[in-house]
Every structure is written in C-alpha cells, then in structure tokens.
A protein has these predicted regions:
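Glycine-rich FAD pyrophosphate-binding loop
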Residues: 7-9, 20-47
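Glycine-rich active-site loop/strand segments that organize a redox cofactor
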Residues: 34-78
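Central helical "cap/lid" subdomain
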Residues: 39, 121-176, 232-234
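Short beta-strand to alpha-helix junction loop
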Residues: 58-65, 73-91, 212-218
Length: 285
C-alpha cells in the first residue's frame, strides 16, 4: 500500500497546478492518472512529426510566463511547442503515477483508502478529484459518496467536441481565421508546431449530433462542408478526427471547489478553473 498525506486524482491542468502549488508551499502530494499521458484536455497530436493542438486550443485566466505567447484570440494564449508542453513543464519534480484508474474509494479511520483497477492500494488523509465532473461524480456514485440528487452540482453539464486535425499544402493569408457554416477554424499560423496545420472545431450542435457516429461517417459529413470552402477543398493533405466527450463545462459551480465529505474535495474546470481552485484549496489542505 502506498500512503500519502494528499492524493490528487487526475493529471489534467487542475491537478498539475494544484500539485505544483502544494509543493511550492512545502506540502508533498501524489497524483494518480488513469491514462498514459499528462495534461488531460491540454493535448497535442503529432501528424508526420508535426504537432497540432486538439484539446484546449487557447488558455485564458493564466499568468504570463516564458512558455506563453500572445495570440490573436481575445484574452487567449497558446503554448509554444504545443499545449501539452505546459503539462510537461508543470509536472517536473511532481510525484505522478500513470495508468492508475481508481474504482474504489472507502472512508477509513486514517483518511481515505483507494483501490485501482490493477488492485494497487493507496491511502491518504485528504483526497481531491479533478477529473471532468461527470467522471468524478460517477466514481463517487459507484462508492456511495455522491451528493444527494437535489444538490446543485448535478445541474452542471458538459458539451461534446469533435475536432478535425489536418495538414495543408499551404496556409493562405485569407485563412488566418475563417468562420464557415457555423464551424470555426482555428489555424496554427506561424506556430512552432506546424506552419500549415489546421485545427477545425466543429460546432457544439454538430458535435452533439454526430458524436456517437463512426469516424468514417463523421469525416464524410465534414468533407461535404470543406468541399464548399474555396480555401480548403483542394489543399488538405492528411487529416484525422479527435473527440472530447467532456469538452467544456456549459456552466460552473458558484465556488472554487466543493467539499463532498470531510477531506474529500471536487475541483477543476466546472468550478473556478485550475489556478483559482488550487489557490482556494491550499489553506484547507
């Protein structure tokens, strides 16, 4: 069994920022991440050795530092060398265990007992869940820890996202930002990642309607749209799709975190976001 004073579930931006702030304040913690990577929805995909951001394309409400470069999006920033580079920088000197999907949480006299699907056991005094709220709530529900159904946290929902990643023969000047049939093209112009890269965020309506369809069916619909664009119909070299079931919280909880039970907390983008949740949690951890 692995014992720590503080355990954070989720190595997305909230979990990493919180762990970094805890370390800076002299407190040690352990992050448990279910996947093989870091950053959650702060994600970069490589196509032909070139990178394209397919998660959170821009960051707001974040402090300037050497890894941030101003972009034309209002109050937005992108990360040089890819959004995932931010996660890598934040994770330096942090204790993180990957591929540890927790499925059991039990209150014990010493705090909280966690069991991963691979049967690894963890114990902590304080536990923070930073996964997208629907995933965190499902874990709590499975362990009879979820708030009553009348609690306002149940009213928070997420929108889905379907994203097309493509490389073009060339990026024309007219294509710096192109709105076309309610779909917005976020173009990686003058990026360190891929000078001719295109990231197309399909509308929320399209994403909701087609999310459960196969990639082939979705691409067929997307190509119908692109073929009507004078800028794109003959320029795409390679492309692939990415999906986010929990892309963005459509509303937020009116507090930076929620204490579900003594020493058991929810935090993240459905609350006040990475920095605000972390700052608010520090005094109670």
């Amino acid at each position: 069994m692995i014992k720590k004073d503080i355990i954070i579930i989720g190595a997305g931006l909230t979990g990493l920022v919180l762990a970094k702030k805890l370390k800076q304040s002299g407190k040690e913690c352990l992050i448990l991440e279910k996947s093989r990577g870091l950053g959650g929805r702060v994600a970069t995909r490589r196509i032909d050795e070139m990178g394209l951001d397919h998660g959170a394309a821009f960051l707001s409400q974040i402090s300037h530092d050497s890894e941030l470069k101003s972009f034309t999006a209002p109050q937005g920033f992108y990360i040089k060398k890819g959004m995932n580079n931010l996660a890598k920088e934040l994770s330096k000197d942090l204790e993180i265990l990957k591929e540890q999907k927790i499925h059991k949480i039990t209150k014990v006299s010493e705090g909280w007992l966690l069991v991963a699907e691979n049967e690894t056991q963890f114990q902590c005094q304080k536990l923070i869940l930073t996964a997208p709220l629907p995933q965190a709530m499902e874990l709590l529900k499975q362990n009879s820890l979820a708030p009553d159904s009348s609690h306002p946290v149940h009213g928070i929902h997420y929108s889905k996202a379907i994203i097309l990643l493509a490389t073009l023969n060339e990026l024309k000047p007219e294509m710096q930002s192109l709105d076309f049939e309610t779909h917005h093209f976020l173009l990686m112009k003058e990026r360190d990642l891929h000078p001719n890269g295109l990231v197309m965020h399909l509308s929320e309506h399209f994403s909701e309607e087609f999310f459960e369809q196969t990639d082939e069916e979705i691409l067929s619909e997307v190509m119908k749209i692109l073929k009507r664009s004078p800028f794109l119909k003959n320029d795409i070299q390679k492309f692939e799709l990415k999906k986010w079931r929990y892309s963005r919280a459509t509303s937020t909880y009116p507090a930076p975190y929620l204490e579900i039970s003594p020493d058991l907390y929810l935090a993240g983008d459905a609350f006040a976001g990475p920095s605000e949740s972390a700052e608010a949690l520090l005094p109670v951890l």
